[in-house]
Each structure stands twice: as C-alpha cells, then as structure tokens.
Amino acid sequence: MGRTLANKQDIVTELKGLVDEAQMAFVVDYQGLTVAEITDLRNRLEASNSVCKVTKNTLMRRAIADADDWQPLTELLKGTNAFVLVKDDPGSAIKAYQAFQKDTKKTELRGGLLEGRLLSSDELKAIGDLPSKEVLIAQIAGAINGVATKLAVGIKEVPNSLARGIKAVSEQTDA
C-alpha cells in the first residue's frame, strides 16, 4: 500500500523543518545498503548533529521548493538518494560519512550544498579534510599565545641587553 497524501504532506513538513535548521546538505547514493548499514550511518552522523533521511526525490523537491538557497540541490535529485542534513559542523559530518564509506565501500557521494552553492564530491572531501572547529580554535589560541610570549621575551631582552652593554663598557674602562 502506498503512502497517503496526508502522510506525504507530513514528510514534506518534517523535511522543511530539517532543511530550515540545516547549515549544509550532502547527497549520498545508498543503493546496495542494508537497513543495518543505513542505521549504522545514521548513528555515526548523529554524533556530528546531522540527520540522514532516505526519502523520495519528489518529496525533497517539494520541501526545498520555497527555499531559494536550496534550489541548486534539485540537480542532485536523481536516483536512489539519502540526504544528510548537517546542523552544526560540516567537517565532522563529512568525516563520519567518509569513515562509513571506507568501511562499507558501497555508497557514493554525489554532491552537496553549502550556503546556496552546489558542491562536488571532491569539494565535500576537501571540507572533510579541514580540521574541526575545536582544533582551529586551539591553533589560533596557540598562535596568539606564541606572539604574546615572543613579545614578552623581546621586552625583557631590552633591559638585559642594556645591562650587558654597560657591564662590557665598565670592564673595558677597568682594564
């Protein structure tokens, strides 16, 4: 038995809510995956605050119909698609998918959308290679701390150099 119109409308409403919350989306060809493998993918993505939805392309097309930023995604709505909607950290979601793909070797990354721009699978992989937000913050903090340390050492060195110069001059006059 097929889905009723009310059921489809509920799915579209749910997808609209997820799209509104999402910062990014990417599309995966899930053909050949078992239910257990899709569940595994969903569990891995949950840690990065992402949702994996397997739905008809027509329902996703209707969910993004009113959102202009999401229109480029319609180019990817062909075939058997799973939609990964990322709420917070795109890098960690892509890394979670790449780890899953490495383990199963059954899926294909078709492309994605970030800030209204369609991304190829290579561009998505490049985003996955970037360090996480926490690592970037730590690197910036370390760089700032390093500059402050060098500045403090430099300021401290001025009186020390002056003292050594005075001592050298006094030793020359004594000799």
Swiss-Prot record:
Pfam families: Ribosomal_L10 (PF00466). One of its GO terms (cellular component) is large ribosomal subunit. One of its GO terms (biological process) is translation. SUPFAM superfamilies: Ribosomal protein L10-like (SSF160369). GO terms for molecular function: large ribosomal subunit rRNA binding; structural constituent of ribosome. Keywords: Ribonucleoprotein, Ribosomal protein, RNA-binding, rRNA-binding. Belongs to the universal ribosomal protein uL10 family. Part of the ribosomal stalk of the 50S ribosomal subunit. The N-terminus interacts with L11 and the large rRNA to form the base of the stalk. The C-terminus forms an elongated spine to which L12 dimers bind in a sequential fashion forming a multimeric L10(L12)X complex. This is Large ribosomal subunit protein uL10. It comes from Synechococcus elongatus (strain ATCC 33912 / PCC 7942 / FACHB-805). The gene is rplJ.
